[in-house]
Design a protein with these regions (language model features):
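Tubulin/FtsZ superfamily GTPase core signature
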Residues: 1-295
């Protein structure tokens, strides 16, 4: 069984993590009190921790239990100041890593974070360094969220510095999601947030399940790491679910790469150095030879 750690850092990371827990509890059918009476059903052994300096951001989480929330004392957040955020992380490094360490060993960690805010963009590079130091054999992948352009110059500047630091790390790759790009398919900003968070959560859970399941062609953590280590070590995720109307394998693959099914604007066919194609369905409908040909 795969041992997975999912860390949501800062407000953006917290909300995506909460969406992950919601999906693991049953998606749209999960009620507001689900966290008190239900346990998320993950495909692997998954531990989740929401980390934030703003206690009010942690309080608003609806599907993440209190034991999975870590408040780093610093009044009410970083106010988009990355320098203050870095100092806050260093001041509280031992308690943060202690909270993670008591949850056991892990094969794979996802760090969910905005690149533009204060806590997420400043904590995440330092946190990833500590994870690689404390768990030498762990695979660490960042799910990095680029800001809406309307958020302003400070947030765009933070994103530039944060991305540079993330790319310089000795980690295993970055999965990019662009809020501005995905807003095109979600309407206005207010309604886009929930849609974007749930979209990322669904794809992340699908990926985890695929890395820890019996398949016609084995796809495991080593394969995922090889793909993420290709090129610039930056990737995105596409997803498509057939509606049951005689959708072919070719159609499924092509649809998963269409702009409205990607988290980031990319010409995958022309620009990708490596790719992993995961197809889930009934065995009688999956022909390995056909899949190999289409890929």
């Amino acid at each position: 069984m795969l041992n997975v750690l999912i860390l949501g850092v800062g407000q953006c990371g917290n909300r995506i993590l909460d969406a992950v827990n919601k999906e693991a509890m049953g998606g749209g059918g999960a009620s507001k009190i689900a966290k008190y009476c239900l346990k998320p059903k993950f495909p692997s052994r998954v531990e989740t921790v929401a980390i934030n300096t703003a206690i009010n951001d942690l309080k608003e989480l609806r599907y993440t239990t209190a034991k999975d929330r870590l408040h780093v004392p610093n009044l009410h957040g970083m106010g988009a100041n990355r320098n203050v955020g870095k100092q806050a992380f260093m001041d509280n490094r031992d308690s943060i890593m202690g909270e993670i360490e008591k949850r056991g060993d892990f094969d794979l960690a996802f760090v969910l974070t905005s690149t533009s805010g204060g806590t997420g963009s400043s904590f995440s590079p330092l946190l990833i360094n500590e994870l690689k130091r404390q768990y030498p054999n762990i695979t660490v992948v960042t799910v990095a969220i680029l800001p809406f352009r309307e958020e302003g110059s400070i947030y765009l500047q933070n994103a530039a510095f944060s991305m540079r630091e993330l790319m310089e790390l000795d980690a295993d790759g970055i999965i990019l999601a662009d809020n501005q790009y995905m807003k095109r398919f979600s309407g206005d900003i207010a309604s886009a947030y929930d849609k974007i968070n749930s979209t990322i959560a669904q794809r992340l859970l699908f990926l985890i399940e695929s890395l820890d399941s019996e398949m016609l062609s084995v796809t495991d953590l080593g394969d995922f790491k090889t793909v993420m280590n290709g090129g610039l070590r930056i990737g995105t995720m596409g997803y498509y679910q057939a509606d049951g109307k005689n959708s072919s394998v070719k159609d499924a693959i092509e649809n998963s790469l269409k702009p409205n099914n990607l988290l980031y604007p990319a010409n995958v066919a022309d620009d990708a150095a490596r790719a992993m194609v995961i197809i889930q369905g009934s065995r009688e409908l999956l022909d390995v030879d056909q899949i190999t040909k289409e890929v």
